[in-house]
Structures are given as C-alpha cells and as structure tokens.
C-alpha cells in the first residue's frame, strides 16, 4: 500500500507467473526475452525514448548483485558488515529513523538512496541478503544471500522474482524473524501465514516466480511520463471540501439541527446559500430528500422555510 506519484498508484495491475522446476537464472533469461519481444511488437524496435533517455530492451541485460551495485554507485562496501555498521553508513547519507530498521531494511534504504535511480538501461539486481527476502530460497553458493532479482528500468523497479522458498521449516523461521522485526517497529514486516506454511508442508516443487507491474510496463513501452497516462481510472486528488456553516449558525436562523445535513445534501452548505432561494423551491428540495432517503422527519410548512430565508437575510 504505497502512496501516489508519477510511478505509483494505490491500485495497480500486476502479472504473477510461476514455473515449476526452474530457478531465478532461468527466469532472468525468460524475462529479458519476453520484454524484448513486447518492445518489438509495440514499437517495431527494441528501443524506446522515455523523456531524455533512450532505453534498449534488447537482450541480454546486465546482472549485478545488490551489494556490488551499492559499492559501484556509492563506494560503500556492505559485504560482511554488521547491522550497526550498516546503520552508521545509512545515517551518514541522511537516512532517518534507522533505529527502527533491521539489517535488510537498512540495505534496501541505502540501495534506494544511492543506486536505484541510476539504472536507466534494464539491469537485473540480484542476490539480495536473506533479511530482505523472507520468501526466497537461500543462494546455492553464497551464504547469507538469496536467489532473488529485481529488474530496474529507467531508474524504477519493473519486476521482482525469486527462486521460491519451498522448505516449510526454513520458511517458518523466516516468518518468526519477520515478527521480531515487526516488534522493533518495521511496518513492512510480514505476519506468519499458517495456511501458506501448511501448503508447503504438503509439498511444493522447486519453483521460480515473478511479479511484473503491468502499468509500469505500459509506461515504459509507450514512453509515457506518468502512470496516470496509462490507467483507465487514475486516482485523482480529492476534491476540495465545500465550506459549511456550523449547526449553531443554522440554528441562529431557525433551522433545527436535524435539517442541517438535509440542506447540505441539497447543496446548501452556507446560511447565505438560501438567501436568494424562493421558499417553495427550498421546501421542494428539502422535502424531496426527506422522502427519497426515508428519513421520517415531519416536513416543515412553506412559512417555516420563508422564516429561515428571512432570518438569513437579516
């Protein structure tokens, strides 16, 4: 549940794909071929101009471990660092509220602050620390890392994928660690999903899975500047609320409290809104709402409406 900006919308379309007996290496190869073919189908070429950048979707894409990406872009080498050492680095580059973050969240924030926005050409950021990836299989040859990648294009994440964790014992331990992070104040930590654990206990084959943001994919393939341009019904800024007279102000001209929301429903928000209205028109509007919504109020006589109007004009 994220906010709204040029690349985020509270409601979005996502494609999830799972393939048994495959791993994240296969999924990277599949993804780069898929995007190359989509780009050719949409644009007749493998290149798209997005703002000032020309992005090439021609496979293969660069594959870069996340810790190497941070080192390349910022100069900070986080490999082998303790949580406290990483926290001090995060503080030094201006990241706030670090005391609430675990090791994985700290690395994620440092990557976002120093590296993410710099990857314009499609780049697979791979091999995330286990603290950042509670649903991902451990790396087959790199202790402490997982078989996960995120695809960065034009400075934003387009896809997230893993070799799926299918060991129920390991998964339960990961969930417990997430609960400990939640206790520390991490609002992005996961809760224990007992149904998921039970399903893993029944058995799940080795699997690779990926999620691709379709709205972001549409932005990239069509060269649009914002996500709002590719959504049928984009989230809009809330309308400004009309100013309203208080119940006391309405009472001052003789309007009983129960009729104030009815007047508002009719479009009369301020006492001054009824000054130029004929009593018969006001009666018709107010009594119409009373009837339509079955409020059960005794309708005022036209003389009472006239009295409200006269008082409003004093």
Predicted regions and their residues:
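Class II aminoacyl-tRNA synthetase catalytic cores and aaRS-like
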Residues: 1-242
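Compact, charge-rich alpha-helical regulatory domains located at protein termini
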Residues: 239-314
């Amino acid at each position: 549940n994220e906010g709204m900006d040029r690349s985020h919308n509270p409601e979005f379309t996502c494609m999830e794909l799972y393939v048994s007996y495959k791993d994240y290496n296969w999924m990277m190869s599949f993804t780069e071929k898929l995007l190359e073919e989509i780009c050719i189908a949409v644009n007749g070429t493998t290149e798209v101009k997005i703002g000032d950048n020309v992005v090439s979707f021609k496979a293969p894409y660069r594959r870069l471990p996340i810790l190497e990406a941070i080192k390349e872009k910022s100069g900070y080498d986080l490999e082998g660092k303790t949580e406290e050492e990483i926290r001090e680095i995060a503080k030094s580059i201006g990241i706030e509220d670090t005391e609430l973050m675990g090791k994985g969240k700290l690395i994620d924030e440092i990557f976002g602050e120093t590296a993410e926005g710099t990857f314009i050409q499609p780049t697979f950021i791979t091999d995330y620390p286990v603290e950042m990836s509670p649903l991902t299989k451990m790396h087959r040859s790199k202790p402490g890392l997982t078989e996960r990648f995120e695809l960065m294009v034009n400075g934003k994440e387009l896809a997230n994928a893993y070799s799926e964790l299918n060991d129920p014992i390991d998964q339960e331990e990961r969930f417990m660690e997430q609960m400990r992070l939640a206790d520390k104040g991490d609002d992005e930590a996961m809760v224990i999903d007992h149904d998921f654990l039970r399903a893993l206990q029944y058995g799940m084959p080795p699997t690779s899975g990926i999620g691709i943001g379709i709205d972001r994919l549409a932005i990239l393939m069509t060269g649009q500047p914002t996500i709002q341009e590719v959504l049928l019904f984009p989230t809009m800024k809330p309308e400004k609320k009309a100013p309203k007279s208080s119940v006391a102000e309405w009472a001052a001209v003789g309007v009983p409290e129960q009729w104030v929301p009815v007047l508002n429903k009719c479009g009369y928000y301020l006492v001054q809104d009824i000054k130029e209205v004929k009593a018969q028109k006001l009666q018709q509007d107010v009594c119409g709402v009373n009837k339509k919504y079955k409020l059960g109020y005794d309708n005022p006589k036209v003389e009472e409406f006239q009295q409200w109007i006269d008082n409003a004009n004093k």
